[in-house]
Amino acid sequence: MTDLTEKNTALEEEKIESAVENQQKSIWKEIFAQGIWKNNPAVVQLLGLCPLLAVSSTATNALGLGLATMLVLTCTNTVISLFRQYIPKEIRIPIYVMIIATTVTAVQLLMNAYTYTLYQSLGIFIPLIVTNCIIIGRAEAFASKNSLLHSIWDGFSMGLGMALSLTILGALREIIGQGTIFEGIENLFGEQAKFLTHHIYHTDSSFLLFILPPGAFIGLGLLLAIKNRIDNIKK
């Protein structure tokens, strides 16, 4: 009788452990899905439209700013989650901005040192990451209320979602506007990355509409339409 009771207890403990493990896995998957698709900063929340529309004239510029944003999001979420218990609620927003500004300054200096041509191309939009609603939004909505590891994963997922949206929009505009993709990628990853540059078609003149700001709005509209169509099909 005692052996049977012990076996039942062991089975119950295994079930509980398995349920907890499955719950943890589902949390990680849900955070990732929120950042990449369900709550994508660019095509769902429509945040950070200023750099999204201004810098996405080429895939290289878009990818560069996307990676910078992802790095800033991950780092700021990490710091804010780590010190969330010590940040006074009354002055949390100025503290968040100070942490974000410090991180952006570090990223800006790194880009100035190692990817100078891209740094010049992105210009004012690197320091403007400080005012990006995505960064402060994740700090307030997630990092200040959740564990360190979950906050790091949220920052990475949201940043990756933003970087993917930027790069896809940049690639779309570059292909239609100039007939190339990843032109100047060596400015971001070095000469060894030149193989990524492709000429889709050759033209004597560029399609200016897609290179200029109107093309950014048209391209973003297309991405929104495609995403909404996919969501409707899934339903």
Curated annotation (Swiss-Prot):
It comes from the Bacteria. It is found in: Cell inner membrane. It is a multi-pass membrane protein. InterPro entries: NqrDE/RnfAE (IPR003667), RnfE (IPR010968). Keywords: Cell inner membrane, Cell membrane, Electron transport, Membrane, Translocase, Transmembrane, Transmembrane helix, Transport. The chain crosses the membrane at residues 63-83, 93-113, 117-137, 152-172, 206-226. Its EC number is 7.-.-.-. It is an enzyme of class 7 (translocase). The keyword Electron transport applies. The complex is composed of six subunits: RnfA, RnfB, RnfC, RnfD, RnfE and RnfG. Belongs to the NqrDE/RnfAE family. NCBIfam families: PRK12405.1, rnfE. This is Ion-translocating oxidoreductase complex subunit E. It comes from Haemophilus influenzae (strain ATCC 51907 / DSM 11121 / KW20 / Rd). The gene is rnfE.
